[in-house]
């Protein structure tokens, strides 16, 4: 991966998309009668080069979303959405899929039948059966939704990265475990700051909330984390409203009353009513235990000299202390066993035992 430059990604996407389009054209223009192999299997195998490029890029984007990587994502996302729509809304291609679906033959295995069913349903759920007018609406809605989803994610990341608290008083970090303090010092150094810096990123936020006794700073962190993208420069309110509206329009176009019903139609739950019933039952069965756990932590906090109401930003600290005292669980003692090299060895060993794979 160290040989890949950011400037390599967009040309790689363009080349892989071109290959995918050529593969689709070959299926559509095949003069032979549609069969499971020349249509369904061919569809399943197309796009593998693009999948490799997407897998590398989007995994690295999640891990290290630099402004340059985000710009690449903004540039390629419309192209990926256009390709997806051009495939699912291609009438000639769908006719071939439909022909195989309606006359599959007796020789298909269970796995083949599953692939055929999922391929056909995937086209239908992506607008293949819509009228030409509705197909154009579907294309517009899905394109805008894709752009909004990317903007939403970028705002969340930008807002998360924008909020930090820098501490220069050694007394305010003296109580923290070494691994927390060292991480904060490294963060400060990376930002060109003095002292120690805590951010909203989980590796920084979570241990600070668990080990710091500074309630004022923890309240600021908690409120910032729980109001992310609510107002300000990175506000996502209008994006969310528009995304919800577009999802409803897509669901209605495809014959579903809600987007939840559309998503659940090919899943075990099947519809929103089933999920709502499950959630209602889950709430009824678990609320008592959640309240009990909350009260237990509150009582423990008061036994430690805490006065007043235990607030949300207090829970992580007293929960961690309670676990350590009652169950002798100490995260700091476990960390030496979870160094990167140790974890990699463990993962590779497990892969060898389960699947016979060897990594060199």
Where are these regions (language model features)?
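Active-site-adjacent "gating/activation" loops or surface patches in catalytic cores
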Residues: 190-228, 315
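Membrane-interfacial helix termini and the short, flexible loops that connect transmembrane helices
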Residues: 27-32, 60-65, 212, 220-221, ...
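Short, hydrophobic/aliphatic alpha-helical segments
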Residues: 236-248
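Active-site-proximal, well-structured secondary-structure segments within enzyme catalytic domains
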Residues: 115-116, 139, 144-147, 154, ...
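Second-shell loop/turn segments in exported
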Residues: 2-10, 123-127, 204-211, 228-233, ...
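Membrane-entry segments of alpha-helical transmembrane domains in multi-pass membrane proteins
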Residues: 2-12, 36-40, 233-236, 275-282, ...
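N-terminal helix-rich structural modules
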Residues: 1-176
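Amphipathic alpha-helical coiled-coil segments and their boundaries
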Residues: 36-39, 116, 123, 134, ...
């Amino acid at each position: 991966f160290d040989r890949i430059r950011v400037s390599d990604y967009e040309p790689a996407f363009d080349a892989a998309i071109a290959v995918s389009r050529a593969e689709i054209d070959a299926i559509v223009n095949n003069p032979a009668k549609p069969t499971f192999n020349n249509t369904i299997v061919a569809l399943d195998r197309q796009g593998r080069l693009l999948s490799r490029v997407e897998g590398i890029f989007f995994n690295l984007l999640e891990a290290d979303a630099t402004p340059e990587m985000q710009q690449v994502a903004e540039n390629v996302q419309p192209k990926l959405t256009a390709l997806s729509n051009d495939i699912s809304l291609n009438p000639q291609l769908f006719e071939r899929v439909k022909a195989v679906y309606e006359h599959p033959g007796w020789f298909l295995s269970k796995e083949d039948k599953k692939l055929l069913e999922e391929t056909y349903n995937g086209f239908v759920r992506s607008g293949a059966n819509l009228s030409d007018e509705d197909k154009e609406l579907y294309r517009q809605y899905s394109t805008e939704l894709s752009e909004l989803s990317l903007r939403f994610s970028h705002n969340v990341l930008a807002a998360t990265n924008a909020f930090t608290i820098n501490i220069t008083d050694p007394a305010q970090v003296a109580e923290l475990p070494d691994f927390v303090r060292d991480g904060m010092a490294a963060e400060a150094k990376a930002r060109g700051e003095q002292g120690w810096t805590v951010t909203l990123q989980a590796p920084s936020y979570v241990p600070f909330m668990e080990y710091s006794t500074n309630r004022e700073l923890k309240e600021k962190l908690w409120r910032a984390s729980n109001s992310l993208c609510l107002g300000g420069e990175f506000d996502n309110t209008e994006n969310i409203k528009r995304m919800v509206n577009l999802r409803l329009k897509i669901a209605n176009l495809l014959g579903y009353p809600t987007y939840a019903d559309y998503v659940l139609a090919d899943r075990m739950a099947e519809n929103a009513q089933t999920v709502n019933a499950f959630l209602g039952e889950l709430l009824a069965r678990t609320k008592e235990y959640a309240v009990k756990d909350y009260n237990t932590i509150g009582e423990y906090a008061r036994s430690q000299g805490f006065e007043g109401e235990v607030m949300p930003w207090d829970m992580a600290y007293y929960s961690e202390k309670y676990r350590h005292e009652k169950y002798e669980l100490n995260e700091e003692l476990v960390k030496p066993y979870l160094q990167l090299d140790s974890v990699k060895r463990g993962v590779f060993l497990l892969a060898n035992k389960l699947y016979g794979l060897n990594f060199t």
